A protein has these predicted regions:
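Canonical Rossmann dinucleotide-binding motif of NAD(H)/NADP(H)-dependent dehydrogenases/reductases
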Residues: 2-41
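Active-site loop of short-chain dehydrogenase/reductase
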Residues: 7, 97-98, 144-149
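N-terminal Rossmann-fold cofactor-binding loop
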Residues: 45-49
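Rossmann-fold cofactor-recognition segment
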Residues: 61-78
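Conserved NAD(P)H cofactor-binding loop of Rossmann-fold oxidoreductase domains
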Residues: 104-110
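Substrate-binding pocket helix/loop in short-chain dehydrogenase/reductase
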Residues: 112-114, 118-123
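A short, exposed helix-loop element centered on a Lys and neighboring polar residues
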Residues: 137-138
């Protein structure tokens, strides 16, 4: 442990999802675990508060790091710049800097073929993935530039 000690990492879609066999199946949670093992403090975003709180509880217990869970939903009906600015402002207030940004979040209409997608289902995928990455990169850039992240 130690490569990312005292570094701050924002991971979108970092909540803890439990599979039917009891294991954790979220890619974001796997990424969070890898950074936690190296001593990074984490800002985890997602739509589901319970998954974020579960991730915070477990990662802090196992790795003695700090985790800031922030509910954030980038969608067609949201003021997405304000949502992302709020996340980044909370990260800076809590940790003072941002060293790494992982744009992991991506929602989709599971089990629906592309041909059967509605416009709303397609918007969900585009906003949660493409637009979220754009807004997070834009808002985090000055802090990442400062820390050479």
């Amino acid at each position: 442990m130690g490569f990312f000690k005292d570094k701050t990492v924002i991971i979108t879609g970092g909540g803890r999802a439990v599979l039917s066999d009891g294991s954790c199946g979220s890619i974001g949670y796997g990424i969070a675990t890898a950074y936690a093992k190296e001593g990074a403090n984490l800002v985890l975003t997602g739509r589901n508060v319970k998954k974020l709180e579960d991730a915070k509880e477990e990662l802090e217990r196992l790795y003695s790091i700090k985790v800031l869970p922030v509910q954030a939903d980038i969608s067609a009906s949201a003021d997405n710049e304000a949502v992302v600015k709020s996340v980044v402002d909370k990260a800076i207030k809590e940790f003072g800097h941002i060293d790494v940004l992982i744009n992991n979040a991506q929602a989709s209409a599971s089990g629906v073929t592309l041909a059967d997608h509605t416009k709303d289902q397609f918007d969900l995928a585009v906003y949660s993935g493409l637009y979220a990455a754009f807004y997070y990169m834009k808002e985090c850039y000055p802090y990442l530039k400062e820390t050479k992240g």
